[in-house]
Design a protein with these regions (language model features):
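N-terminal helix-loop segment corresponding to the beta1-alpha1 unit
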Residues: 2-208, 240
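Short Gly/Pro-enriched turn/cap motifs at secondary-structure boundaries
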Residues: 67, 76, 241-246, 252-253, ...
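Active-site-adjacent beta-strand anchor residues
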Residues: 89, 111, 214-217, 264-266
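A short glycine-threonine-serine/GTX helix/turn-capping micro-motif
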Residues: 177-187, 209-211, 241-245, 249-251, ...
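Oxidoreductase and adenylate-handling cofactor-binding alpha/beta cores
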Residues: 189-209, 222-234, 277-282
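Beta-strand segments within the central parallel beta-sheet cores of soluble alpha/beta enzyme folds
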Residues: 209-217, 323
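Beta-rich nucleic-acid/ligand-interaction surfaces
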Residues: 220, 339-340
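Aromatic-enriched alpha-helical interface/lid elements that frame and gate functional surfaces
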Residues: 250-327, 331, 338-339
């Protein structure tokens, strides 16, 4: 086995520390993002992760390029640090035997096959639990292991569309927009790693493993959070407000006199008063009945945001960022990845 990618700076930072999952061994049969990010979190916490890949081609994410480093796609590098990799033909008797011998030495088993595939390969939960009852077995799939939709294929962008996340993003007068990140994959993977850690703790007490069933659909529903509760509360979906926030004003991006953008967020009345009184020297905006309370500012969002836009257009971005921070207002320059 060889290390396929190691974050050297991370290793240097933690090499003198005791990590909470040291001594835990994970057999990782997952690929792309959700499963690999789950096991990468476990590796970062000290677990030894053995990644199983297809002979000749490996994880599909190796080929997701450009860009690439040393022939490896950026997707693969993003979600597979601190792991050991071995190529195994699981469809062969020898390959299956190797998987079983590895599983016998592991505490955790993670897979993200479509439901039914693990059983056909002979590495499903029931089979492994019968052989290794202490093994924590985590399945990551699109719609879960059971139910009328369990056999459907699914990827992050589809769930962003299907579960309503896209409908929340975009300008009020435009259509839905997909956030350009694999948000559902990432959230689902964190739920999976959290569940695995909880199951490991239970394993230490009971001596038994368990089957963890994590789905992208469940992750997508959870991501909706307060947006879902907004709908349950009033029966209407939250409006699209571009870079703003449906129930909090002011939140958004503003341009300074130099065209530079900065972002501020006043989530409490105290922060709002810091903005208009301390930073802008406009106590009248704190006293105006239209803007004095959060409900009024939400109702009069367009008028209020226009007032702020006019004020901020008088000075360059950096002037405002410094002044807002001095006043205790959460803010920051809008940067691209080069600048960040």
């Amino acid at each position: 086995m060889k290390e396929v990618f190691v974050d050297r700076k991370w290793n240097e930072a933690v090499m003198t520390q005791h990590l909470p999952l040291e001594g835990i061994r994970v057999l990782d049969l997952s690929r792309i993002i959700a499963g690999p990010n789950c096991t990468m979190q476990l590796a970062d916490l000290g677990a030894e992760v053995i990644k199983i890949e297809i002979p000749g081609s490996g994880d599909d994410s190796r080929r997701m390029k450009p860009p690439e480093v040393g022939g490896e796609g950026h997707f693969y590098l993003a979600f597979n640090r601190n792991k050991k990799s071995v190529a195994v033909d699981m469809k062969s008797p020898a390959g299956l035997d190797l998987i079983m011998r590895l599983a016998a030495t592991c505490d955790v088993f993670v897979e993200n096959f479509r439901p039914g595939v693990a059983k056909r390969l002979g590495v499903d939960y029931e089979t492994l639990h019968a052989k290794f009852p202490r093994l924590v077995y985590c399945s990551v799939s699109a719609y879960g292991q059971e139910g009328m939709m369990s056999d459907r294929p699914g990827l992050d962008p589809v769930f962003q569309a299907e579960m309503g996340l896209m409908s929340l993003c975009g300008e009020a007068d435009g259509g839905p927009i997909r956030p350009p990140l694999s948000i559902i994959d990432l959230f689902t993977s964190l739920y999976a790693s959290t569940a695995v850690c909880a199951a490991i703790a239970d394993q230490k007490t009971t001596g038994q493993g368990r089957h963890i069933d994590v789905s992208l659909m469940g992750g997508a529903i959870s991501v909706l959070g307060n947006a879902a509760q907004y709908y349950f509360t009033c029966g209407e979906p939250p409006p699209r407000v571009g870079n703003g926030f449906p129930t909090v004003v002011p939140v958004g991006a503003f341009a300074g006199s130099d065209g530079g953008l900065f972002y501020l967020a006043c989530g409490t009345q105290k922060l709002y008063e810091n903005l208009v009184i301390k930073a802008l020297d406009r106590p009248d905006l704190a006293e105006d009945p239209r803007f004095a309370g959060m409900g009024g500012r939400v109702e009069h969002r367009t008028v209020f945001m226009s007032i702020l836009e006019e004020i901020f257009a008088a000075e360059p971005r950096d002037h405002w960022v410094e002044k807002l921070r001095t006043a205790g207002v959460p803010c920051g320059a809008v940067r691209n990845l080069d600048e960040a």
